[in-house]
């Protein structure tokens, strides 16, 4: 069990649904209102103090989406592990491609879970008394110094794999993870990505590592094979931990989350959405790479799937706001905001759709955008996506005004 000290850190349709669920009491406390940020053209709106709304069902929907999404991510990582095992059993171009395709597919679920970060939940908690941290850094750290793991162009003996004094074990791999340099990443999605694809030296396609790097009993191939197996298993272990902490009807983080102060909890949820939008996606993953023009600043540079990262991060935000995930249709925050400010809800939906559209228009692979000259259509499309994400985050902050909570844009 994870306890709190480890985590310090249309109106009519909506109304009818809430009444059917027994979650809304229309006890008007008083007619007070707030004027929203005029730059966003949000009109006078009802505050949460005017309605006795039971917020818990919205939080329960959110929690179930988190659980289902992490469950899918773990299941798809299991499928990837099987594909990698088949590849290592019979290393050839076909099994190699199948393993790479499984990695790409598995990423799609995980990327949506990034909408659950930035409030020190199971994914990124920090225990100040022990220094223990959530597994986010082990799972998805980037950018990475690939030479810390394996050979790179011009350095055939680089990395832990080619160091005869380093014993390939999960303990050793974890002990060396991001110790002296945050770029010295030894685990997670991008370590697996590098091992499967190798370095990417052109803007026409992904890395071209050969399957022959994994033929047994040749050079350091056995060490490379073992390393790939171990970091894949570690990824699944970390995903299983996240899945278990959000499992329903258990003595875990989810139980505490649902029973915490509901307004404060919703503030955390929208801080997560705003931060993913404006800081992580807009700034760290698009703007930084555009400014440098360096392929190494791509989020998924080895596989050339950075565009997929943007698409499924945006989908994760969509899932949370509308309370939908695949076949699960819960009570969405769109329904809550519709009760309080239909115009704000409309603006959020417009912003979400604009972000999805602008991201879909980014040229792919993304390294072609980075290689494009300043002022080119390719760069302008990416810059428009940045603006859309920033606008989206600012509108999310207006939810804080309606609910009387803090919605922040955090910078790690």
Describe these PLM feature segments.
Residues 16-29:
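Bacterial N-terminal signal peptides
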Residues 7-9, 18, 39:
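Positively charged, low-complexity intrinsically disordered regions
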Residues 1-13:
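N-terminal secretory signal peptides that target proteins for export/translocation
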Residues 40-412:
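Mature extracytoplasmic or organellar-lumen-exposed domains after removal of signal/transit peptides
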Residues 2-3, 31-32, 74, 82:
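Domain-scale selection of a single, long terminal region
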Residues 29-43:
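Signal peptide processing junction and immediate N-terminal pro/mature segment
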